Amino acid sequence: MEENEVESSSDAAPGPGRPEEPSESGLGVGTSEAVSADSSDAAAAPGQAEADDSGVGQSSDRGSRSQEEVSESSSSADPLPNSYLPDSSSVSHGPVAGVTGGPPALVHSSALPDPNMLVSDCTASSSDLGSAIDKIIESTIGPDLIQNCITVTSAEDGGAETTRYLILQGPDDGAPMTSPMSSSTLAHSLAAIEALADGPTSTSTCLEAQGGPSSPVQLPPASGAEEPDLQSLEAMMEVVVVQQFKCKMCQYRSSTKATLLRHMRERHFRPVAAAAAAAGKKGRLRKWSTSTKSQEEEGPEEEDDDDIVDAGAIDDLEEDSDYNPAEDEPRGRQLRLQRPTPSTPRPRRRPGRPRKLPRLEISDLPDGVEGEPLVSSQSGQSPPEPQDPEAPSSSGPGHLVAMGKVSRTPVEAGVSQSDAENAAPSCPDEHDTLPRRRGRPSRRFLGKKYRKYYYKSPKPLLRPFLCRICGSRFLSHEDLRFHVNSHEAGDPQLFKCLQCSYRSRRWSSLKEHMFNHVGSKPYKCDECSYTSVYRKDVIRHAAVHSRDRKKRPDPTPKLSSFPCPVCGRVYPMQKRLTQHMKTHSTEKPHMCDKCGKSFKKRYTFKMHLLTHIQAVANRRFKCEFCEFVCEDKKALLNHQLSHVSDKPFKCSFCPYRTFREDFLLSHVAVKHTGAKPFACEYCHFSTRHKKNLRLHVRCRHASSFEEWGRRHPEEPPSRRRPFFSLQQIEELKQQHSAAPGPPPSSPGPPEIPPEATTFQSSEAPSLLCSDTLGGATIIYQQGAEESTAMATQTALDLLLNMSAQRELGGTALQVAVVKSEDVEAGLASPGGQPSPEGATPQVVTLHVAEPGGGAAAESQLGPPDLPQITLAPGPFGGTGYSVITAPPMEEGTSAPGTPYSEEPAGEAAQAVVVSDTLKEAGTHYIMATDGTQLHHIELTADGSISFPSPDALASGAKWPLLQCGGLPRDGPEPPSPAKTHCVGDSQSSASSPPATSKALGLAVPPSPPSAATAASKKFSCKICAEAFPGRAEMESHKRAHAGPGAFKCPDCPFSARQWPEVRAHMAQHSSLRPHQCSQCSFASKNKKDLRRHMLTHTKEKPFACHLCGQRFNRNGHLKFHIQRLHSPDGRKSGTPTARAPTQTPTQTIILNSDDETLATLHTALQSSHGVLGPERLQQALSQEHIIVAQEQTVTNQEEAAYIQEITTADGQTVQHLVTSDNQVQYIISQDGVQHLLPQEYVVVPEGHHIQVQEGQITHIQYEQGAPFLQESQIQYVPVSPGQQLVTQAQLEAAAHSAVTAVADAAMAQAQGLFGTDETVPEHIQQLQHQGIEYDVITLADD
């Protein structure tokens, strides 16, 4: 369908020399919009129009002010100051109804470019207004076009009438219907309508066709319009009715009349002050509104600087203004989304710099009428002159092309370029609120109008002076003035120096720079020359001079080598050094609960635990505590370790666990209940934490804190892993430098440092030495009061633990106790005269027999046999010695009174007592017998020893050794090496190695190593004398011994004469586990592991901690728990940190329920009351069990604790745990026998003896010629009721334990010293008839 164009009469004759300018009545033929620019961006109304459902009604008042334009197509020469023509936006959208109730009315007339029907309705309040509108429409449309229109007039409420003109399509093929337009006639018509401005509002209805939006055209008035024939035109009628109301004074449109009237009252008929106030409430500044009436009365040509909207944008000749009119659009209110209209989108303006805002000018208006300012195209130009009548109209098709090129052609004066107005209505994103920029708000919000929206603090401002450029605040007006003057060109981010050319983008930098011109900075440190611009810098700097400030330590340089502080070995990593340091420690915190082995390193311990995990089926492993099953051993091990917890206190509300009860109480109070369980006893203070209560009592109740602290002792901090303090490292250094171990090839006695031979007189240690001839071991005890108790404990230790047996090489341990009083006196006094009785400390000599073995056979002492030594106490007087020995036996004969024999041997032993009658002046004798004669060792006054004759040596006599170890209390001195000698050949067996001296604090004289011991290794077999570098291989070797020259596999009948063959065969049985658990799939190589495993099924935990109540299934675990969690320093009690010779700690254990008796005996043995009175001793012996044991230091760090399983003669199996911390043997289990805590000792049957490796029982060895037994048997021989060594009640209580009988016998023998001496031999004879060699300690009173 072709479009109809309405052309004016001036289109054909354009003015000479004038370019064709677009008119606001031009039609957009072939384009989507008629006019592409208007003044809507400067005339944005605060209120938003409401569109109807058709989507056409919308508000176009989106600018900052409304602008009215003067038509350039008018042919009149006179300006029309009171005439307001519609702008392009109204023309492009259709007919507009004029509002006559306000200021001068704007008459809107239009014609459609396309042959569609247009329906225009006008409602007037009077017939005059309606007739005027009819005349204007008739003159605008033209006489030729009005013939094809239908006029429909209808009455409305209030007497208003609506006249509708139906423009019909022509009968031809869409030929354009044109009529000449006279602008002068239109002007006269508008002037006539102005006289009716007081009438009611008239509206118009625009009927738009489907082909596109209609564009109004101003046409000259015409007279004599006639109504067309309706019947002939009905077939060509197509009507689309859209009712719309438009304001004549601005571009506001509305679909309802009420909204338009409200808009006109608020925007056009309110006083200026009220309008400004309303605009201020909406948060926007209307720059175009006039403020005074004097400005309204000025002429339109008069220019005033106060009316300039943006002086920077207008006067900026370099065109570098950053002003953008689009930024002013959303100031007052948020833009609403416009609904899409059926019109095609208007052409978009090309992106580019926005044009400058034109200057506003006030035109002369009649009194009482508010006028809108006219807009000029340039700020310096005068209002536009009326155009020539012959000026070209904008309705021509040639001008339509120019209108499409808005950005290239000059735009009509008074038309602003608005992106928001030219945007397509169907694009809602164009009207969204602009995102707020971060940082300081825009300068447009810094005006007075927006101050009421600022946050005002109720407190007075510390810096009341505000810079409006950058928003900074200052204390004084002078600082503000200096700051404002420093802003370069008003830029908030650029500062300049007022005295030089310095520029900076930071105010602080400029402030610091300005002090270069002043000469000094205002703030200075009081203690040094430091100055600064800011006081806070000086305050921060002053902390350097504060004494209370903790100085940061200098960063330690990264080390590439980590030397060991003890031995000097260097490691490349700290982790390796930490692991190495554990080798110097005696602590083995990790103990296996299945086999009893302990380890220093957790990694080694975990690797060992993997050996106890057995597969269930198909290489799947099951947890022993729950139903967890996995395929990885290590994963299962980590899972099982999670079941073992050292935190017995568990929260009842959550899974929290801890090892201290006060921690649990604090946790429950803080996390769950909110209570304060720890209350002060002296006031009302209470707290949730125990440490706060202690702090409160110490600060607030200082006088009562000491008493309160005794009732509430502070628990020591727990240490969960080995820790090496500086003190411990220094002790380890001294041990390493003082007692270095000998090389493996020569295990002879090391050099004894001076501190090894010194001992304190107040705490007299037991000194042990060995005689190479007779294997004699001498114990020296100084101090008259302590001699009895210390001698008793040392003798029992040697008898029961046999800690020195391995070093002496003996298999039969016999103890002889000799007591003398005047030995020290003879050595100390000149001429050998005895000293006074009170100045001589007691000397106790312990004689150990030399066993028959390889070492004894090499010496020239006679045949290798086991000498018979029988204990025979003699009736000692006040002074004298008792030397007990036996004559040498013939080769091949056995001793009738062997310690392991059950035959009575009372008559075979001979006792020789050297009394005062045998002493000579200045000489003391120790006599021994070879069966026919006595030999003696003479001790001279200077301490030298007179050796016996060579005949005595050739006779093979066993010569005991006497060493003076007692010194006066006030002057302790180390004994001279000249006072300690070994009688016999220098190639005899070696003396006590460092293990014994370390464990018991021995003074060992240095001697050169012999050839026989030089080739020996650390561990050797006593049957075949084969040496081994490790204990494990030696134990395997001993188990395979089937005789002196044969070996047999312990798991099968295989046998061989060479150990390597059996060792290679035994490797095939290494994976065999014959002992199967009856409740699960566990299997072990031996019975002891199986018995330990069974405890996991019974869940038996017999050992309980008395401090926290946690229970354990191993006593060693309990001790480790107490040491780790409850020990103050994290060490094992009784285990000294240093290995230097110190006093051997003692322990007294009484098993009874009477606390008084326990305290009595404990005090007697450990508080320097060595000699017990008859009353106290009788009170102690009346209890059930008295077991005296000695805890020793660890002799070898690498030895781990182990479990030994022993089968008794009656078929019972006893398991013993030998720990490495104190070398004490514990009973693990014994069938049918109640456990006796904490120690149990055994007596071996005939033909066997116990080998001791560094204080640990390693194996049971057969004597030469004795029958070999497949399984070792150890027999417990109880004391018979007929023996009267102790009371009947004590014998019944000690029936299960031989060691209890030994201990009781020793104590009873000590008690017998206060009785008759005639009963003592009878008791010894009774013991000998029983076949048990009980070693009796003879104690003599002063």
From Swiss-Prot:
Recorded GO CC terms: histone methyltransferase complex; nucleoplasm; nucleus
Residue spans of biased composition, Polar residues class: 201-217
Region named Disordered: 1-102, 201-228, 274-442, 732-763, 964-1013
Annotated crosslink Glycyl lysine isopeptide (Lys-Gly) (interchain with G-Cter in SUMO2) location: 1022
Molecular function terms, GO-annotated: histone methyltransferase binding; RNA polymerase II cis-regulatory region sequence-specific DNA binding; transcription cis-regulatory region binding; zinc ion binding
Cell membrane recorded as keyword: no
Gene3D superfamilies xrefs: Classic Zinc Finger
Residues bearing the modification Phosphoserine: 976, 992, 1007, 1153
Tissue spec: Ubiquitously expressed.
Annotated InterPro entries: Zinc_finger/UBP_domain, Znf_C2H2_sf, Znf_C2H2_type
Compositional bias annotation for Pro residues: 740-753
Zinc finger (C2H2-type) in chain: 245-268, 465-487, 495-517, 523-545, 562-584, 590-612, 621-643, 649-672, 678-701, 1019-1041, 1047-1069, 1075-1097, 1103-1126
GO biological process: brain development; brain morphogenesis; cerebral cortex neuron differentiation; epigenetic regulation of gene expression; in utero embryonic development; neuron projection morphogenesis; positive regulation of lymphocyte proliferation; positive regulation of neuroblast proliferation
Signal peptide: none
Compartments where found: Nucleus
SMART domains, sorted: ZnF_C2H2 (SM00355)
Pfam families recorded: zf-C2H2 (PF00096), zf-C2H2_6 (PF13912), zf-H2C2_5 (PF13909)
Comp. bias intervals (Acidic residues): 297-327
Record field: compositional bias (Low complexity): 34-49, 986-997
Record's keyword terms, sorted: Activator, Developmental protein, Disease variant, DNA-binding, Intellectual disability, Isopeptide bond, Metal-binding, Nucleus, Phosphoprotein, Primary microcephaly, Repeat, Transcription, Transcription regulation, Ubl conjugation, Zinc, Zinc-finger
Assembly information from the UniProt record: Interacts with NCOA6; may enhance ligand-dependent transcriptional activation by nuclear hormone receptors. Interacts with CNOT6. Interacts with CNOT9; the interaction is direct. Component of a nuclear receptor-mediated transcription complex composed of at least ZNF335, CCAR2 and EMSY; the complex stimulates the transcription of nuclear receptor target genes such as SOX9 and HOXA1. Within the complex interacts with EMSY and interacts (via C-terminus) with CCAR2. Interacts with members of histone H3'Lys4'(H3K4) methyltransferase complexes ASH2L, CXXC1, KMT2A/MLL1, RBBP5, SETD1A and WDR5.
Family as reported in the entry's similarity comment: Belongs to the krueppel C2H2-type zinc-finger protein family.
PANTHER family, A to Z: ZINC FINGER PROTEIN, ZINC FINGER PROTEIN 335
Associated clinical condition: Microcephaly 10, primary, autosomal recessive: A form of microcephaly, a disease defined as a head circumference more than 3 standard deviations below the age-related mean. Brain weight is markedly reduced and the cerebral cortex is disproportionately small. MCPH10 is characterized by extremely small head size and death usually by 1 year of age. Neuropathologic examination shows severe loss of neurons as well as neuronal loss of polarity and abnormal dendritic maturation.
Stated role: Component or associated component of some histone methyltransferase complexes may regulate transcription through recruitment of those complexes on gene promoters. Enhances ligand-dependent transcriptional activation by nuclear hormone receptors. Plays an important role in neural progenitor cell proliferation and self-renewal through the regulation of specific genes involved brain development, including REST. Also controls the expression of genes involved in somatic development and regulates, for instance, lymphoblast proliferation.
Protein name from the UniProt record: Zinc finger protein 335
